[in-house]
């Protein structure tokens, strides 16, 4: 196997010159640069990415810790992040926690050992041990709205409480008074914030929040399906159901139609996230829009800026940034107007 010394010997230059050509860390004459690359090709020399990263202090890689890349909302964000990383010349290490807090710590440990330049976090399964692990390193990090607040990382706030309020207010404005909610598990930051938005809107309108109409479940179609079936077994039914996410709404609609009822004629349904497939539901789903592409680009831009600052001034303390973007209502066909 060829080494950098073999390349230098063939060209008649020092190994330092070859290194500068490969890493583009110093100007090298055009003829010499061409000769180095020709020698690399002829010898089939493959520079060690690890060794190169030790010299230039970068691996051109980013780690992303996410609850699950299988869920449509997360999958769309991962796609946006990966595409934007690619355009910026970075590789992406994707780590799924699958709702396992222990995996967060293991993934953090692995990413740090791989010397990634920065880390994105999009999960709620975060322990004090995980925080201690990260705080013991200098790896730049950006945390999404539902992640931990360690006082050190940049954060992106998506104002999902406002989104939950917006969804509920839309139902109220359309004449609905008997409203149920099928939320994600409320120990998760994002599920709790969306639920709090529901409570705020119902309270402002002076409407009764029935405990028997509050459900918690997985952010999956199965979770929505199970909870909706439990709701349909009750004597009194709501005129509308708020879903913690669009994936849950798919299960909710399935449960309603299997009972011989219709959406929205019998029960209206509103989702959250505006995933790509929600427009193709039957009926097309009214939902709360969260721009996955914008979120992904904002996260990467923020992280790359922090990485650059870290490389240029590693000992300089930084003040964490808070970036914000807001949800929007997307009206389709799954909510009936009872005022008409």
UniProtKB/Swiss-Prot annotation:
GO biological process: negative regulation of DNA-templated transcription; purine nucleotide biosynthetic process
GO MF terms, alphabetically ordered: DNA-binding transcription factor activity; transcription cis-regulatory region binding
Classification via PROSITE patterns: HTH_LACI_1, HTH_LACI_2
UniProt KW keywords: DNA-binding, Purine biosynthesis, Repressor, Transcription, Transcription regulation
Disulfide bonding pattern of the chain: none
Functional pathway: Purine metabolism; purine nucleotide biosynthesis [regulation]
Protein name (record): HTH-type transcriptional repressor PurR
Gene: purR
């Amino acid at each position: 196997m060829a080494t950098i010394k073999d390349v230098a010997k063939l060209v008649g230059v020092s190994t330092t010159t070859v290194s500068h050509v490969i890493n583009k860390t110093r100007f090298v004459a055009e003829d010499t640069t061409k000769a180095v690359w020709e020698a690399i090709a002829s010898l089939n020399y493959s520079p060690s990415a690890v060794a190169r990263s030790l010299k230039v202090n970068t691996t051109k890689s980013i780690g992303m810790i996410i609850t699950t890349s299988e869920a449509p909302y997360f999958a769309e964000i991962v796609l946006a992040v990966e595409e934007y990383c690619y355009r910026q010349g970075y590789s992406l290490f994707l780590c799924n926690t699958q709702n396992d807090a222990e995996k967060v710590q293991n993934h953090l440990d692995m990413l740090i050992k791989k010397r990634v330049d920065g880390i994105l976090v999009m999960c709620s399964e975060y322990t004090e041990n995980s925080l201690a692990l990260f705080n013991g390193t200098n790896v730049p990090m950006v945390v999404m709205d539902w992640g931990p607040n360690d006082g050190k990382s940049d954060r992106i706030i998506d104002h999902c409480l406002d989104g939950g309020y917006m969804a509920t207010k839309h139902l109220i404005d359309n004449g609905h008074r008997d409203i149920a909610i099928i939320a994600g598990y409320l120990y998760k930051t994002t599920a709790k914030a969306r639920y709090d938005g529901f409570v705020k809107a119902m309270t402002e309108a002076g409407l009764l929040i029935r405990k028997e109409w509050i459900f918690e479940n997985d952010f999956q179609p199965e979770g929505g399906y199970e909870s909706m079936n439990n709701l349909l077994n009750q004597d009194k039914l709501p005129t509308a159901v708020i879903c913690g996410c669009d994936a849950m709404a798919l299960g909710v609609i399935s449960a309603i139609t299997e009972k011989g009822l219709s959406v929205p004629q019998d029960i209206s349904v509103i989702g959250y996230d505006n995933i790509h497939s929600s427009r193709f539901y039957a009926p097309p789903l009214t939902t709360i829009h969260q721009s996955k592409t914008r979120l992904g680009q904002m996260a990467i831009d923020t992280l790359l800026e922090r990485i650059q600052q870290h490389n240029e001034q590693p000992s300089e303390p930084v003040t964490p940034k808070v970036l914000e973007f807001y949800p929007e209502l997307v009206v389709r066909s799954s909510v009936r107007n009872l005022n008409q």
